Amino acid sequence: DADYAYLIYALGRVADSDLSNALANIQRVTQDMPAPVQKYLNRTVGYIGGTTVMKNGFNRDVLNAFDQSYGLPFTPEEAEIYARQAIRFGSWESVIRAIDSMTMTQRQEDRWQYWLARASEQRGDKGSKKAAEEIYKRLAMSGEDYHNLLAKDRIGQRYNASAPQEQPSVSDQTRLNQDIHFRRAFALRNIDAPAVYTTREWNWAVRQAYLKHDDGLLLAAAKRASDMGWYDRAIYAADRTEKKHNYTYRYATPHQATVVSHSRNVGIDPAWAYGLMRQESRFVSAARSHVGAGGLMQIMPNTAKLVAKQMGETYNPAALTDTNTNIRYGTFYLSMIQNQLSSNPVLATAGYNAGPNRAKRWQPDYQSLSADQYTESIPLSETRDYVKNVMTNATHYGILLGQGPQIIESRMPTIPMRSIQ
């Protein structure tokens, strides 16, 4: 019906400009309408509310609108937005409904399997708890990424203290010398060709080895790149092995004495600093972002000026490219924002990427929130993935730095309520 279509469009426009008004009036507007129209109206407002969290903040009425729209087919994007809203507010039955509304491929992703288990165990009955435990066990055995590590924690497993250290054979290293793609990449590197060319050639060589499931060749390439100090490409190759892994290449620890010393001087965990540095620059000291952040810890010039002032130093733009100074400033700044954000490393990690004010704005204002819920509900996808990656990296670095068996949740304390100042 055209009239209903116009109404849905009009309510969508209202929600775009004044979400609170749309949420407050949606039940009054829809009360005498056919059920499918009511669902469409609720879905429209729920979707807009879920995609404008950066502007409007979190609102339980947005989740209610999604709940009221249940029964209509969900697009993959709508289902994910619904799931994250439900996760944010701990509405576990809604989490299950949202995941059930996803495509088969989508719901089989590790993140949604993890949240299906998290939601199922909240039901409390033996069947649901057993189903959740089976999912956790499967995830715990299938990898060592963020959701795999969380799953290990849920069933009481600690991440093993002996990181994989598979070495390439002599034969693998001989084959590396003969591989035309890797030979070109190393030749370009040796003549200091522009990074765009060396990286392109390297990535192509890695892709060919990966498509052949040639872990030995990938490890040989990673070892040689690591020995050359070409850490970002060593990581790129080591990340793509399927059965044979070497985490000293995958989680490189260059400048270890410097990182450990400066981290300890400001009271932060060196494994966390390494986890962040790996995510920021892959240890490319000359890395420069499109917004001007530079160096190993990708420090913005204004941040460097602030840190220099706090440390009683005169700011020098060249400091960003000096390895020692970049690490010293980066660890100081990370410690500084951690102190501003309830001494919580998850909040500080989000703040390092998106700014401390945003990380604080995303804190709950109604009750404390588990760190995995906070992380999954971060409205910026870049920051959401960033926090997951840094926490995962830090867990692996904890092992490599001799900190013993790791529990990722020990790095992710509960997120406190936001203090209104």
Give names to the regions the model predicted:
Residues 1, 144-162:
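Long, contiguous interaction/recruitment modules in multidomain scaffold/adaptor proteins
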Residues 1-4, 109, 177-180, 188, ...:
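Polar helix-capping/helix-linker motif
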Residues 4-9, 43-47, 76-80, 114, ...:
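Alpha-helical tetratricopeptide repeat
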Residues 5-17, 177-204, 208:
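Alpha-helical segment of the N-proximal tetratricopeptide repeat
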Residues 12-13, 48, 52, 85, ...:
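Residue-level signature for tetratricopeptide repeat
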Residues 21-39, 45, 54-57, 61-85, ...:
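Catalytic glycan-binding domains that act on GlcNAc-containing polysaccharides
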Residues 152, 159-181:
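Alpha-helical solenoid repeat scaffolds of the TPR/TPR-like class and their adjacent stem/linker regions
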